[in-house]
């Protein structure tokens, strides 16, 4: 970071209900938004014509608005479907990038749907067990430990 701080420097930006550290480079600062990784933030910055060496606090309001519109409407800016984190949605069949609070809502809806249709994954979630086929005989135990009493 340069020794002289510009007069319009923002130390904390508020983007999509998330506080972003203004001292970090813009590509890495955007990853603090839930649902945005390094690859997605990189392509969004390139589509918005923002210099990747800039700090997040150095951006103008117009540049921040441009970033937000591209992140919310990625398909309009020719970001490919395989790049998005919500593909062929169960309800409407659309491709989208789900971020921030809507990511939590979508995840909860998906789990509720799995539980409602009594799918194996939904039942494992309901019971609080491992879902992805891990062994559970010895690992992942929680709760009260039962010790072995010593023989007299």
From Swiss-Prot:
GO terms for cellular component: cytosol; small ribosomal subunit. One of its GO terms (biological process) is translation. It comes from the Eukaryota. It is found in: Cytoplasm. Coiled coil: none annotated. InterPro entries: Rbsml_uS13_C, Ribosomal_uS13, Ribosomal_uS13-like_H2TH, Ribosomal_uS13_CS. Pfam families: Ribosomal_S13 (PF00416). SUPFAM superfamilies: S13-like H2TH domain. GO terms for molecular function: rRNA binding; structural constituent of ribosome. Keywords: Cytoplasm, Ribonucleoprotein, Ribosomal protein, RNA-binding, rRNA-binding. HAMAP family: Ribosomal_uS13 (MF_01315). Belongs to the universal ribosomal protein uS13 family. Located at the top of the head of the 40S subunit, it contacts several helices of the 18S rRNA. This is Small ribosomal subunit protein uS13. It comes from Branchiostoma belcheri (Amphioxus).
């Amino acid at each position: 970071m340069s020794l002289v701080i510009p007069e319009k420097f923002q130390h904390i930006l508020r983007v999509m209900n998330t506080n972003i550290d203004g001292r970090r480079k813009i590509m890495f600062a955007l990853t603090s938004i839930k649902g945005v990784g390094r690859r997605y933030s990189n392509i969004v910055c390139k589509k918005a014509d923002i210099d990747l060496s800039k700090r997040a606090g150095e951006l103008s309001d117009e540049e921040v608005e441009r970033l937000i519109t591209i992140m919310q409407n990625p398909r309009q800016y020719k970001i490919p479907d395989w790049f998005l984190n919500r593909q062929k949605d169960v309800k409407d069949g659309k491709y989208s990038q789900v971020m921030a609070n809507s990511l939590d809502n979508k995840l909860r809806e998906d789990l509720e749907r799995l539980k409602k249709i009594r799918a194996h994954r939904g039942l494992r979630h309901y019971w609080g067990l491992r879902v992805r086929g891990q062994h559970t005989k010895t690992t992942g135990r929680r709760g009260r430990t039962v010790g072995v009493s010593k023989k007299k």
